[in-house]
Swiss-Prot record:
The gene is ndk. Belongs to the NDK family. PANTHER family: NUCLEOSIDE DIPHOSPHATE KINASE, NUCLEOSIDE DIPHOSPHATE KINASE DDB_G0292928-RELATED. HAMAP family: NDP_kinase. Homotetramer. It is found in: Cytoplasm. Pfam families: NDK (PF00334). ATP binds at K11, F59, R87, T93, R104, N114. InterPro entries: NDK-like_dom, NDK-like_dom_sf, Nucleoside_diP_kinase, Nucleoside_diP_kinase_AS. GO terms for molecular function: ATP binding; metal ion binding; nucleoside diphosphate kinase activity. This is Nucleoside diphosphate kinase. Its EC number is 2.7.4.6. Its cofactor is Mg(2+). The keyword Hydrolase does not apply.
Length: 139
């Protein structure tokens, strides 16, 4: 099994509702390790660049507005098959379809405020990690 890194973002709704510790517990209980973490307030420009892949989708403006509405916590997770493992822990994008025992299944109610973001591929994980972290921050 491959040791991988992936990006996690605890979105403004997770920070606002004070459930970041609970989410971190789900992450760590799965065997993934948090090797870098910082709280930040995304600028509109940062959010637009990060979610650029969605720029032509009807929800893009709402997504950017939401992601800049409060603090987020960006994290780098490491472990065996970290990308797919974290996606399993997060649960389905739509919380109504997410299994109980997943972050979204247990803590989210709405697809537009679904608590967390996780990289969807190893290639995107590398890009997303580099967007937020310098190599020297990954210890």
């Amino acid at each position: 099994m491959a040791i991988e890194k992936t990006l996690s973002i605890l979105k403004p709704d997770a920070v606002k509702n004070n459930i970041t510790g609970k989410i971190n517990s789900y992450i760590e209980s799965s065997g993934l390790k948090i090797i870098a973490q910082k709280m930040m307030l995304l600028t509109k420009k940062q959010a637009e660049l990060f979610y650029e892949i969605h720029k032509d989708r009807p929800f893009f403006g709402e997504l950017v507005e939401f992601m800049t509405s409060g603090s987020v916590i960006v994290q780098v997770l490491v472990g065996e098959n970290a990308v797919s493992k974290y996606r399993q822990i997060m649960g389905a994008t739509n919380p109504k379809q997410a299994d109980k025992g997943t972050i979204r299944g247990d803590f989210a109610d709405d697809i537009s405020e679904n608590r967390v973001h996780g990289s969807d591929s190893l290639e995107n994980a590398r890009k997303e990690i580099a967007f937020f972290f310098a190599e020297c921050e990954l210890v």
